A protein has these predicted regions:
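Helix-terminus loop motifs that line ligand-binding clefts
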Residues: 91-93, 259-270, 295-375, 379-400, ...
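Aromatic-lined, polymer-binding surfaces characteristic
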Residues: 277-278, 332-338, 356-361, 368, ...
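Well-ordered alpha-helical scaffold segments within catalytic/enzyme domains
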Residues: 225-234, 247-251, 285-298, 363-380, ...
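Extended ligand-binding clefts on enzyme/binding-domain cores
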Residues: 312-349, 355, 423-431, 448-546
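Solvent-exposed loop and edge beta-strand segments that line ligand/cofactor-binding
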Residues: 46-48, 210-220, 224, 230-234, ...
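Extended, well-ordered alpha-helical scaffold segments
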Residues: 202-224, 237-244, 295-313, 323, ...
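Terminal accessory carbohydrate-recognition/targeting modules of carbohydrate-active enzymes
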Residues: 19-241, 276-278, 283, 292-299, ...
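Bacterial Sec-dependent N-terminal signal peptides
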Residues: 1-22
Length: 637
């Protein structure tokens, strides 16, 4: 009996190993079929499965203010033909979406070179092949856009209705020899945009132009690539993902030509159709760091100045129904959550009150200090020093509680005030931000000691209250049981990734503990956000994978970092070089309870197989930016 049992176990293990080997060798397949174009003013989404532009919007942000959403000005733009494209892709990793047909290409873009609120479609081919081609579209104020099945604003119900009055036009022009370009233009008027001649003027300009606008747009983005630092050691796939990430970062930043002056420079957490096309401080801070690392200094500076100028400070005091004041209690400049499209601070509400997130202070401090350190922009530092001291760094210090941790807030996962906690992530990023700011203050011969001391206080508070068994860190000070929802928290790894704690032995023991409970099953590493039956929390989070990879690099574990980083690269390579919020995991999906399955209409994360792109796509700060920061660290000498 014992021999039979042993043989059965060995056979089972062999079969599992064989299956795992087969799965490991299985090539990745595309799982995301939408592409986005934006010029920081307008944004449009191409649906490759349906061969159409789902919709085009007059702004890249979700809400003007607390009471008004942004609606599309046109929907379902389709080529008036039964022919389907052979291939769809971003043209040379730019913002131009190209659909290749047998005898012509169709190119979709918002124009950076023109900087206008016109959506352009350019058919390119021989005259006889394109002269009779045209498009049909859903237009008209109040008309519902058909075919949209997922929310594009988590507070906005379906269906989505068109707003504004459509303006259209077309023109044919010779490109070279017998090749022509046929331009189709879509714009609008509304209460904020009243230029009824915008399309006719653009058509006249196209007709007279000596260059192709399509070529001008591609050249614009390629020039941006050349302005960035892209190490020659990158693989071809890595270079493609980095270039596309540069385009995404550029597309996600509001243009200086946006009609709302306080919105200039704000960076979306995602592009449409991803749900999070809102300027979060957290995501924006990582995006700014990535811009700085790339050499996109002008864009990084604009991102910082947007937050330094934005109207804010509205939650200095916030008394919740439990009678506690969750505000910082002092004047502050950086939003406690995110920003409306008009540039004002927004702390989004639900039945449990607003989100109030003090980690934003620390993350902004880090992004600010990183920019100044890498650019040596002393004039910028001096210009904003008073605001940075009094309304950012001092505001952070004021949030340190009596136990040497940042006071309770909504946390990095935004649970509002339902269960406020003192989070490891929050204290960790605030400690690191103050630490870096103190060093810069000292470098500029300015007062620094209180920031240095505050950083040391927070670090000691983390070691005292968050370190368990001298081996690993829990997610917050409040939860005592390992079964608690946020006891184990993927955000914990930020204290290693940002360089606050550089104890390799402690990192490895923390890794060992979290591998038991937060790592997905299978041959490759991958990590969930929280132990949960909610699919938005229990799937594999790309941002967490990348921050763990960054922590591995700081600990000298380059091979372990590569396992996480390479999978992101390989996935992006088959999905137009974009990066999602999450990857699906079937075993984790089986843990999702029925009451959470309806969440799919907003979270886009219910799938029946592994390794699918899910959640918000494309992610900017938590996607493209986090990838760039990790990849560049990997190739650092």
């Amino acid at each position: 009996m014992k021999i039979r049992y042993i043989l059965a176990v060995l056979l089972s293990l062999f079969c599992q190993s064989l299956l795992s080997a087969q799965e490991a060798g299985k090539p990745l397949e595309p799982s995301y079929f939408k592409l986005t174009t934006s010029n920081g003013l307008i944004v449009a989404v191409y649906n490759a499965k349906e061969n159409r532009i789902d919709d085009a919007y007059p702004h890249i942000f979700a809400n003007y203010d607390s009471g008004q959403y942004v609606y599309p000005f046109v929907g379902n733009i389709r080529l008036n033909s039964t022919e389907r494209p052979e291939k769809t892709y971003y043209l040379k990793n730019t913002h131009i979406i190209t659909a290749s047909y047998k005898d012509f290409t169709v190119n979709y873009f918002s124009s950076f070179t023109r900087g206008d609120i016109i959506f352009y479609i350019v058919i390119k081919g021989k005259k006889q092949n394109i002269k009779d081609l045209s498009f049909i579209a859903e237009t008209g104020k109040g008309k519902a856009v058909s075919g949209i099945t997922l929310l594009e604003n988590h507070l906005q119900d379906l269906p989505i209705h068109i707003a504004g009055n459509i303006l259209t036009g077309s023109v044919m022009r010779r490109y070279a020899n017998d090749v022509y370009e046929k331009y189709f233009l879509y714009s609008f008027t509304d209460s904020l945009h009243t230029d009824t001649a915008i399309v006719s003027r653009a058509i006249a300009r196209l007709a007279k132009s000596k260059t192709s606008l399509l070529d001008d747009e591609a050249r614009y983005m390629k020039n941006l690539f050349s302005r960035c630092t892209i190490p020659p050691a990158f693989s071809a796939k890595e270079k493609n993902v980095v270039e596309q990430s540069i385009s995404i970062l550029k597309m996600a930043q509001v243009s200086d030509k946006e009609i709302f002056p306080f919105s200039h420079g704000q960076i979306m957490a995602s592009l449409r159709p991803g749900l999070w096309h809102v300027a979060w401080v957290r995501d924006g801070s990582y995006a700014i760091q990535a811009m700085t690392r790339l050499g996109m200094y002008a864009e990084a500076k604009k991102g910082l100045e947007f937050m330094l100028k934005a109207p804010s400070g509205y939650f200095k005091h916030y008394i919740y129904k439990d009678g506690k004041d969750y505000g910082p209690g002092v004047d502050y400049q950086i939003s406690l959550t995110r920003y409306f499209g008009n540039g004002k601070e927004e702390c989004d509400y639900n039945e449990f009150g607003p989100n109030i997130e003090f980690d934003d202070f620390g993350l902004f401090l880090t992004a600010f200090c990183d920019y100044v350190s890498r650019t040596n922009d002393s004039a910028f530092y001096k210009k904003w020093n008073q605001v940075m001291c009094t309304k950012v760094a001092d505001a952070t210090v004021s949030c340190i509680d009596t136990n040497s941790l940042i006071k309770a807030d909504s946390g990095p996962w935004e649970h509002h005030l339902e269960m406020p906690r003192q989070y490891t992530f929050t204290s960790g990023v605030c400690a690191r931000g103050l630490e870096q700011f103190g060093k810069l203050q000292r470098q500029f011969h300015l007062p620094y000691k209180k920031y240095k001391l505050a950083a040391e206080t927070l670090k000691q508070g983390i070691m005292t209250h968050m370190l368990c068994d001298n081996r690993y860190f829990k997610g917050n000070v409040n939860d005592q049981l390992k079964t608690a929802h946020e006891y184990y928290d993927g955000g914990v790894f930020e204290i290693f990734a940002n360089g606050l704690i550089r104890d390799k032995k402690l990192f490895l023991s923390n890794m060992e503990e979290y591998d038991k409970v937060m790592r997905i099953k299978g041959n490759r590493p991958g990590y969930i956000r929280l132990i949960s039956a909610d699919p938005y929390e229990n799937q594999e989070w790309v941002f967490i994978n990348l921050r763990i990879a960054q922590a591995h690099l700081l600990a000298g574990n380059k091979p372990d970092a590569a396992k996480l980083l390479d999978f992101v690269t390989e996935q992006a390579a088959v999905n137009n070089n974009t990066i999602p919020e999450m990857y699906s995991n079937k075993l984790q999906m089986d843990k999702v309870t029925d009451n959470f399955r309806s969440n799919n209409i907003w979270c886009n994360c219910i799938r029946d197989k592994d390794d699918q792109y899910i959640g918000t796509i494309p992610m900017v700060g938590y996607g493209s930016a986090a990838y760039i920061l990790t990849l560049y660290s990997y190739y650092d000498k």
